[in-house]
Amino acid sequence: LWSVVVYDSPEADRMTVVDKHVAGLPAIIEDGTLVAGGQINDNSDPRKPIGSSLMIRADTKEDVVKILKNDTFGKYNIWDIDNAIIHNLFCVYREGQAYQL
């Protein structure tokens, strides 16, 4: 499992392709790739999107980058994938499930 924070490129306008992005989500949710995700908003203006936070199931960091690049936001350079913050995550708890010691 991977924790991802990917900010939008400085001049990006995600609203121009958000419908295409959302239309692609069911496939990666249903196959278990996207565990959780959502829009990150600017703290000073909660209506202004600045990126995305995701939990992605993949084997390697390189696989995560491929998933990001295949997303509409990746294809249209909305996300600044080169500067994405990607870390392997050992998930101890998520709603409905807890790690058993």
Question: Each PLM stretch: what is its role?
Answer:
Residues L1-L101:
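Conserved, structured core segments of small domains
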